[in-house]
Amino acid sequence: MAEVITEYRNENTKDIDLLSTIDMVRKMNEEDQIVAKVVGEEAPNIAAAIDVIAKAFLKGGRLFYFGAGTSGRLGILDASECPPTFSVDSTMVQGIIAGGEKAIRNAAEGAEDNFGAGREDASILTEKDVCVVISASGNPKYLLGVLEKADEVGAATIAVTCNSKGHIAEDAGLVICAEVGPEVIAGSSRLKAGTAQKMILNMLSTGAMIKIGKTYENFMIDLKAVNEKLKDRAIRIVSQIAGVTNSEALAALL
């Protein structure tokens, strides 16, 4: 197996089990400060990925996130927020997790080792689509199967990882590698690695939607007003852009 940085022991937290609760929290927060800086260093690669995704959207393509465990759940989370935020069809951005729907709530640890399942799940891809594989370690065989199938159909491939020595970093067309270092608890990649992945996915989907015109300035002008909070937001957006009262904005929206 390739070297896995996320499995290393963090020298800064060796005594975490002996700390007071407040010192434990401060130690975790200290480690979290690393994440934003490391993600920022990947800005050029993130920007390149956004341009690839936006170009695919404009040509009728879709964005697929593939991952196992925490990484898969983060992909599903990001995908699920796109329809209400940007008023896009639920098929435009999709998250797929190793092990299927049941793995969203319950750990399916062995699923990440299934190369064939990755190929099968990736059979949904076409040459118009973008395939983003997400993994802290960069080594799940499931994702290697996804990448192999994606290459066969001609889909663009992007790896989001925290390990430059992982296999997906070798196989993907574009790599975003946020090496956040060893976790507070050795191997618990839901922590710093998961935070880094969430930040990156936020930028990928939001950036691509901005590029295809889903915002005006920094307003989400294509939102679906499906609840009271979003209806109120729609009124405020129209009011601020048009320079009218909330009542006038509401009347225009009805």
Go through each PLM region and give its residues.
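A short, well-structured juxtamembrane/interface segment
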Residues: 41-56
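Glycine-rich phosphate-binding loops that contact phosphosugars or nucleotide phosphates
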Residues: 64-199, 208-212
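Gly-rich Lys/Arg/Thr-decorated short loops/hinges at beta-loop-alpha junctions or inter-strand turns
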Residues: 29-35, 95-105, 216, 234, ...
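Internal, active-site/partner-interface "lid" segment
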Residues: 206-241, 246
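Short, glycine-rich nucleotide/cofactor-binding loops
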Residues: 35-44, 133-140
